[in-house]
């Protein structure tokens, strides 16, 4: 059996954030199980988050092919620095809420000219290079992971040139049904072009892989011929040294980004009311947001005299530093996207939340995929945004347990471990032989 597999990914260390970890961990455990993964990734990517701590998980024997990429962000930055005196970050192309004229223009250009995304210029040179590479190295299996969905078009190009290749298209997010597209002011022509590209990938890939049951059903309804589900997960190695300790304050933490689609205010209003109604809660509680937080939510907190005393913001931390925080946390706040397809939203961090053993209180669709996992694992609750009394009851119950020193250890076992998930991926790849 040929155990060589080429993985084509935009996000790779030192890139940080959740997008990199899925395939970083798969590569780690594929290598441990006798497979030979090759990783193809940009030499000079434009990403918003850097995390060098993730480099420790890259197996030294894995060949990383770093190939030059040109992205319009670089040119756009030069233009914006001339006209506005500051650079525009990649995330500004998809900013929600109040936008400057420059941001509106950038989003319109991004949505209607760079289809499926701004990495489209990497497709042809990558196909030309990799067509020779897979033949020289006798690779017969390739995996593309998106977003960015341009990478699936690299896979499509390779498959068309080498019909014997087995191609897995991994969707960490939807494509034509992705809520992000609704923020980009797409013309009808642009949206239809997304759908045509998506259809070609769904029809030509030997397997469509995705991360939630909701997305699995979506892709089946869109006509994908072989859809498989392998969720995200947690790496047991990351949690071996995490020790829970009694906290001097009742500590509620949210880890990750806050934006217009992920709104923690329902939980914050409940905490505010509890502070006003319960003196002991008001004295003991502290809330910490770790990661990028938009100005609207910061303003909401800072303008409230109660919340301002209890809520702090910490900028982005390396993954190894984030892991340490789990041991000094009492409740983890999970904020799910409120959007058309929110039922399928399972943030990658949910699985690390589960592995931490801390109680989870979530905001979002109470019948969605994330809520189902949390409920099945007995790890907490997910409440609808308008359930003010539900949030108050959940926080008060957790606070009572903290006061009594009876905080339960809710750590899940191996259902979502990266090692077990890699076994599922291997079974999928072996089915091609």
Predicted regions and their residues:
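N-terminal subdomain of nucleotide-sugar transferases
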Residues: 1-73, 207, 216, 227, ...
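A conserved catalytic-core segment of Leloir-type glycosyltransferases
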Residues: 42-120
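Acidic anion/phosphate-binding donor-loop and adjacent secondary structure
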Residues: 72-78, 234-249
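Membrane-proximal helix-turn-helix segments that form the acceptor-binding/catalytic region
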Residues: 131, 150-153, 157-161, 175, ...
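Carbohydrate-associated surface elements
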Residues: 214, 233
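Conserved donor-binding/catalytic core segment of Leloir-type glycosyltransferases
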Residues: 245-262, 268-271, 421
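Nucleotide-sugar-dependent
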Residues: 262, 318-325, 332-351, 360-372
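Nucleotide-activated donor-binding/catalytic signature segment of Leloir-type glycosyltransferases, i.e.
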Residues: 284, 289-291, 296-323
């Amino acid at each position: 059996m040929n155990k060589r597999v080429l993985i084509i990914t935009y996000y790779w260390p030192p890139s940080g954030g959740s997008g990199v970890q899925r395939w970083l961990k798969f590569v780690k455990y594929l290598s441990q199980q006798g497979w030979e993964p090759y990783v193809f990734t940009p030499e000079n990517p434009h990403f918003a988050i850097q995390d060098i701590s993730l480099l420790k998980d890259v197996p030294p024997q894995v060949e990383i092919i770093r190939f030059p990429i040109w992205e319009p962000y670089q040119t756009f930055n030069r233009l914006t620095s001339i006209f506005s005196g500051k650079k525009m970050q990649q995330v500004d192309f998809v900013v929600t809420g109040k936008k400057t004229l420059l941001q509106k223009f950038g989003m319109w250009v991004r949505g209607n000219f760079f289809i499926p995304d701004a990495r489209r210029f990497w497709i042809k040179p990558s196909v030309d290079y990799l067509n020779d590479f897979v033949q020289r190295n006798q690779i017969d299996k390739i995996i593309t992971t998106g977003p960015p969905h341009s990478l699936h078009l690299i896979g499509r190009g390779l498959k068309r040139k080498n019909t014997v290749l087995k191609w897995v298209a991994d969707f960490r997010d939807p494509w034509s049904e992705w809520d992000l597209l609704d923020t980009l002011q797409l013309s009808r022509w642009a949206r239809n072009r997304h759908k045509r590209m998506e259809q070609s990938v769904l029809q030509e890939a030997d397997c469509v892989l995705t991360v939630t049951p909701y997305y699995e059903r979506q892709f089946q309804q869109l006509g994908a011929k072989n859809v498989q589900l392998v969720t995200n997960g947690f790496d047991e190695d990351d949690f071996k040294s995490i020790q829970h300790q009694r906290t001097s304050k009742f500590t509620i933490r949210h880890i990750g980004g806050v934006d217009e689609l992920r709104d923690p205010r329902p939980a914050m209003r409940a905490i505010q009311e509890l502070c006003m109604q319960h003196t002991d809660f008001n004295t003991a509680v502290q809330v910490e947001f770790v990661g990028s937080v938009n100005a609207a939510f910061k303003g909401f907190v800072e303008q409230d005299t109660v919340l301002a005393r209890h809520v702090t913001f910490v900028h982005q931390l390396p993954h190894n530093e984030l892991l340490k925080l789990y041991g000094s946390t009492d409740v983890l706040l999970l904020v799910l996207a409120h959007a058309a397809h929110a039922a399928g939203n399972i943030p990658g961090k949910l699985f690390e939340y589960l592995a931490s053993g801390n109680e989870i209180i979530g905001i979002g669709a109470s019948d969605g995929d994330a809520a189902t996992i949390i409920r099945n694992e007995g790890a907490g609750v997910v409440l609808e945004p308008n359930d003010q009394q539900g949030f108050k009851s959940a926080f008060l119950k957790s606070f009572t347990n903290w006061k009594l020193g009876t905080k339960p250890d809710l750590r899940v076992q191996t259902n979502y471990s990266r090692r077990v998930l890699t076994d599922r991926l291997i079974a999928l790849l072996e089915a091609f032989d």
